[in-house]
């Protein structure tokens, strides 16, 4: 009888083409998502060597990073470098026969929101993209991770990838979340616990009652930030919620093919007794709403907490790093998180730009007004999310409260388009990274859940969403 296997083991084994004595493996890739930033050199490499895209039907190209999210974006992109990248993707997709969603296509959006929406993302698949947040798709029980530009070219040409197998890590979140504590708080708490290097060399499987209780969109938020915990990929075993989400999606199997697929997907569970190289356990009931205070996703604390004192850290290198973070963030040890005032609020990104996120925001801000000191924007993660939000009247709630309602794209998650922070501006953001300069030169980013960001926009400072009325 074969040894018990983890979910990661099963997907890996199903896609293993070849393994060398040194552990180097050739892995078959089921789905390849492409965007404008990491693909131009890859397509040029194909062109120079006279190669074709091996499986264009398994490849999907979407513009997201550089596209403007302002209402006048149909007028074009002002920044020349950004415009060239977007134009190159359109040209390359047409030349190589790859399906392409332009900025004028309502299916366009952030690639990691578009894939699941279209049924392009399915359980048990290997999925890659030249983007580190490809881990998002692991919410479906797919082995998904980012790749570099040379690897993008390799996958386009061969539909395979050279890899070495990672270790298995389990993060189990037991119990149920308290009211107003979300998937975003779970993943920030996990990263705070294990650190940004805690998952290095591993693929993380997320399990436990709290994870199972999450919607598919909540699970995507969890897997999205796996990379911030140091692991290339995160996985959640598929279940009935997964199957229901997939049914009816444009590219999903239909009829008998769907039933056959579901029968296979049900086997994608870790076997009893399977070995994990590392196990981390958290108690969901004890988790508060969380805010980041520094310039790393591991710099997190309860909204009711205070900015920590780096002098309490014994390791000199880490202590110096945290003092630098506080200096960059313009904060002093002992400051209450709820005393920190804000200049900007950004709600969106591949972490929290889905319809459920926007519904939570609407609940918080309906009938209220954004603080006069705050510039707040909401950016739907795709054209379909925008369409759904407007069908539900959410846009009217946002506009009445004083939020800027934008077109879909990556927006202020990263300073690669017109949406960015000015030096010294402080932002509550539902995105995934708070590195120095991530949202703009000398911009200061605090990572929070959508509801926390919404409440902060109204109050002008961080507030405990559990006490919000």
UniProtKB/Swiss-Prot annotation:
CDD domains, alphabetized? IPMI (cd01583)
Catalytic reaction equation(s)? (2R,3S)-3-isopropylmalate = (2S)-2-isopropylmalate
Q: Which domain of life is it from?
A: Bacteria
Cofactors per UniProt?
[4Fe-4S] cluster
Function comment: Catalyzes the isomerization between 2-isopropylmalate and 3-isopropylmalate, via the formation of 2-isopropylmaleate.
| Subunit architecture | Heterodimer of LeuC and LeuD.
The protein depicted here goes by the name 3-isopropylmalate dehydratase large subunit
Instruction: Please tell me the species this chain comes from.
Output: Rhizobium leguminosarum bv. trifolii (strain WSM2304)
């Amino acid at each position: 009888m074969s040894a018990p296997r983890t979910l990661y083991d099963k997907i890996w084994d199903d896609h293993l083409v070849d393994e060398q004595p040194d552990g180097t493996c050739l892995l078959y890739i089921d789905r390849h998502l492409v965007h404008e930033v990491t693909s131009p050199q890859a397509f040029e490499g194909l062109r120079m060597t006279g190669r074709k895209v091996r499986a264009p039907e398994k490849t999907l190209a979407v513009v997201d990073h550089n596209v403007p999210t302002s209402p006048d974006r149909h007028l074009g992109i002002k920044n020349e470098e950004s415009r060239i990248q977007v134009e190159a993707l359109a040209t390359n997709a047409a030349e190589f026969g790859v399906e392409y969603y332009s900025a004028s296509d309502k299916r366009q959006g952030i690639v990691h929101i578009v894939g699941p929406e279209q049924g392009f993302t399915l359980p048990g698949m290997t999925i890659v993209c030249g983007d580190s947040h490809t881990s998002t798709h692991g919410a479906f029980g797919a082995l998904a991770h980012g790749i570099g530009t040379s690897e993008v070219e390799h996958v386009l040409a061969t539909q395979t990838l050279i890899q070495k197998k990672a270790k298995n890590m389990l993060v189990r979140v037991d119990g149920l979340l308290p009211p107003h504590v979300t998937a975003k708080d779970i993943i920030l708490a996990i990263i705070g616990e294990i650190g940004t290097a805690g998952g290095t060399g591993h693929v993380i499987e997320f399990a436990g009652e709290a994870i199972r209780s999450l919607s598919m969109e909540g699970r995507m938020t969890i897997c999205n930030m796996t990379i911030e915990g140091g692991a290339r990929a995160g996985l959640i075993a598929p279940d009935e919620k997964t199957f229901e989400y997939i049914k009816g999606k444009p590219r999903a199997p239909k009829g008998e093919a769907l039933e056959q697929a579901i029968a296979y997907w049900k086997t994608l569970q870790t076997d009893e007794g399977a070995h994990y190289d590392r196990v981390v356990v958290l108690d969901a009931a004890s988790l508060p709403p969380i805010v980041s205070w520094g310039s790393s996703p591991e710099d997190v604390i309860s909204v009711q907490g205070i900015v920590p004192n780096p002098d309490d850290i014994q390791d000199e290198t880490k202590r110096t790093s945290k003092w630098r973070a506080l200096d960059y963030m313009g904060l002093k040890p002992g400051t209450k998180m709820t005393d920190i005032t804000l200049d900007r609020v950004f709600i969106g990104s591949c972490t929290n730009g889905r319809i459920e996120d926007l519904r939570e925001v609407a609940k918080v801000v309906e009938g209220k007004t954004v603080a006069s000191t705050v510039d707040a924007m909401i950016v739907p993660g795709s054209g379909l999310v925008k369409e759904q939000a407007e069908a539900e009247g959410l846009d009217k709630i946002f506009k009445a409260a004083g939020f800027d309602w934008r077109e879909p794209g990556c927006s202020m998650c990263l300073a690669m388009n017109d949406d960015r922070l000015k030096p010294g501006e402080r932002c509550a953001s539902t995105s995934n990274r708070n590195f120095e300069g991530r949202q703009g030169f000398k911009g200061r980013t605090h990572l929070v859940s959508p509801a926390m960001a919404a409440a902060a926009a109204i109050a002008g400072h961080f507030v405990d969403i559990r006490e919000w009325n």
